[in-house]
Swiss-Prot record:
Keyword entries, A-Z: Ribonucleoprotein, Ribosomal protein, RNA-binding, rRNA-binding
Cellular component terms (Gene Ontology): cytosolic small ribosomal subunit
Organism: Phytoplasma mali (strain AT)
Domain KH type-2: 39-111
Name of the protein this chain belongs to: Small ribosomal subunit protein uS3
Name of the gene this protein is made from: rpsC
Record family assignment: Belongs to the universal ribosomal protein uS3 family.
Described function: Binds the lower part of the 30S subunit head. Binds mRNA in the 70S ribosome, positioning it for translation.
InterPro entries: KH_dom-like_a/b, KH_dom_type_2, KH_sf_prok-type, Ribosomal_S3_C_sf, Ribosomal_uS3_bac-typ, Ribosomal_uS3_C, Ribosomal_uS3_CS
GO biological process, one term: translation
Organismal lineage: Bacteria, Bacillati, Mycoplasmatota, Mollicutes, Acholeplasmatales
Length: 245
């Protein structure tokens, strides 16, 4: 059944962690889930050009005040930060208006976007919308991903390929992508491309390697220094943050 299920959801709690990290009683859970949905929808809709890979939301309480911390993993941090962090301050105020809570932002720049499945899928979708040939799009994407040193990559595009009336699917596989092995660090992403021939579905699987007992994904993937800005209501910057993607 590993072929049919979402590889990200199948590995949650085993080698992967949740994007929303908080605890709440049953009365507040629906409210928090709705707030998380609104936050992610707002950021993805208004700042898609920044190539957003992941939005992590953490909640805490300090002196009867609810605080939301958002870790934003992006490929183009300049679009989010803007000049003198003006864009970041604007996003913070807008999300505070939506949630009515104090919001802290941590922008984490991804050093190698070709290694992240969702960014590869978004790039492929953008090329399809620019009328690139679907086979060329997949081969170019696979070549770039393999240069990063991953163990395997798989792509699949579905829709009216080549403008034909009958929809079909076509994909490529290079290396090894073990979907049934739970310790395998398989990253999966899906997005859509809207073209003159209709909507195309784009799927990408990237195999980073096996996660051994006692290790996590962060241990197996090589860490690197990144730039980040941490902005609150008081517009204070935190120390440089080091993360991994």
């Amino acid at each position: 059944m590993g072929q049919k299920s979402n590889p990200n959801g199948l590995r949650l709690g085993i080698i992967k962690n949740w994007d929303s990290k908080w605890f709440a009683n049953f009365k507040k859970t629906p409210q928090f889930i709705h707030e998380d949905f609104c936050i992610r929808n707002f950021i993805n809709k208004n700042y898609s050009k920044a190539l957003i890979a992941q939005i992590e939301i953490e909640r805490s309480k300090k002196k009867d005040k609810e605080i939301i911390k958002i870790n934003l993993h992006v490929a183009k941090s300049n679009i989010i930060n803007g000049k003198d962090n003006e864009s970041l301050k604007k996003i913070t105020k807008q999300i505070e208006q939506i949630t009515k809570k104090e919001v802290f932002f941590n922008v984490i720049e991804i050093k190698n976007p070709d290694k992240v499945a969702i960014l590869v899928a978004k790039t492929m979708a953008e090329q399809l919308e620019q009328r690139f040939y679907f086979r060329r799009v997949q081969k170019m994407a696979i070549q770039k991903v393999l240069k990063t040193g991953v163990k395997g990559v798989k792509t699949l595009i579905s829709g009216r390929l080549g403008g034909l009336e009958m929809a079909r699917s076509e994909g490529y596989l290079e290396g090894r992508v073990p979907l049934n092995t739970l310790r395998a660090d398989v990253e999966y992403a899906f997005t859509e491309a809207h073209t003159t021939y209709g909507s195309f579905g784009v799927k990408v699987w990237i195999f980073h390697g096996d996660v051994l007992p006692g290790e996590t994904i962060l241990d197996t993937r090589k860490p690197f220094a990144i730039k980040s800005n941490y902005i609150s209501k008081n517009n204070k910057k935190s120390n440089n943050y080091k993360g991994d993607k």
